[in-house]
Amino acid sequence: MPEGFRCGMVAIVGRPNVGKSTLMNALVGQKVSITSRKAQTTRHRITGIQTTDDAQFVFVDTPGFQTRHATALNRSLNRAVTSTLTSVDAVLFVVEAGRYGPDDAKVLSLLPRETPVILIVNKVDRLDAYTRAEMVAVFLQEMAQVFPFKEIVPMSAKNRDDILRLLGIVRPYLPEGEPMYDPEALTDRSERFLAAEIVREKVFRWTGDELPYSSTVVVDKFETEGRLRRVFVTILVDRDAHKAMIIGAKGAKLKQISTEARMDMEKLFDGKVYLEVWVKVKSGWADNEAGLRAYGYE
């Protein structure tokens, strides 16, 4: 590695649905964290790795901090957020441009004062083009009074130039040192884990507002033979009615979920995928501490 090479961990935090996973995928240059317009899409800490000529960035995408429903699942998600903050070199605190409310403030109150915090003002591209510059300027002034941020970065996670600029801003906050991961690595998560996340993303996209939060995905079997993967998964739901919603009329919705998931897996794994998806009812799974640990939650 060249002299002055830097390597460190950077947490991406914020309230649900501010674009944390989209930002991480853009920073890594590959889809490693699932996205959805619905809140609570991310349920696990996902590590994304970006290695450049002079640095390795290890980004940790955390679940959005949950303040409204005191289930065992949401307690698990919040533990994932708070435990991450104790082990990183810098924090990217993500808010939506023009919007800062009680849920954002709750997350900000958890951030350690001794760790550099960089404010990411995301989704500036969604503001009205005629008033954008003025609105952003006012919002940045307001946010500068809220917390001693090391940097304040207005941007869009969908803009490649903004992403490159952000990497340059973050690099000085990483300690000098050897890379933690192979330069070709994109994530520390297994293909088995990523397969479950991809199926869960499709459930989020193809079902109503209530259902995603009462469902999870379990990989029953994951086999690799050359470039072929055989993946067998079960979608667990809370009620019979939810099972019917996922399956859809004559199995149409389940087929759509399965087809899109298989295509995403083939793109990510760079090979053919045989995918079988089943739906089962397991009442109360989201409020069972022992069961959640068995499904990989903290």
Swiss-Prot record:
Keyword Cytoplasm applies: yes
Membrane topology term: Peripheral membrane protein
Pfam families tied to this protein: KH_2, MMR_HSR1
Keyword rRNA-binding listed: yes
Record-level GO BP terms: ribosomal small subunit assembly
One Gene Ontology cellular component annotation held by this UniProt entry: cytosol
Region (G1): 14-21
Chief location: cytoplasm
Domain KH type-2: residue ranges: 207-283
Record keywords: Cell inner membrane, Cell membrane, Cytoplasm, GTP-binding, Membrane, Nucleotide-binding, Ribosome biogenesis, RNA-binding, rRNA-binding
Region (G2): 40-44
Region (G4): 122-125
Subcellular location: Cytoplasm; Cell inner membrane
Domain of life: Bacteria
GO MF assignments: GTP binding; GTPase activity; ribosomal small subunit binding; small ribosomal subunit rRNA binding
Region listing for G5, in residue ranges: 155-157
Region (G3): 61-64
The Era-type G domain, residue ranges: 6-176
Subunit structure: Monomer.
Function: An essential GTPase that binds both GDP and GTP, with rapid nucleotide exchange. Plays a role in 16S rRNA processing and 30S ribosomal subunit biogenesis and possibly also in cell cycle regulation and energy metabolism.
NCBIfam families listed in its UniProt record: era (TIGR00436), PRK00089.1 (NF000908), small_GTP (TIGR00231)
Record family assignment: Belongs to the TRAFAC class TrmE-Era-EngA-EngB-Septin-like GTPase superfamily. Era GTPase family.
Protein name: GTPase Era
Source organism per UniProt: Ralstonia nicotianae (strain ATCC BAA-1114 / GMI1000) (Ralstonia solanacearum)
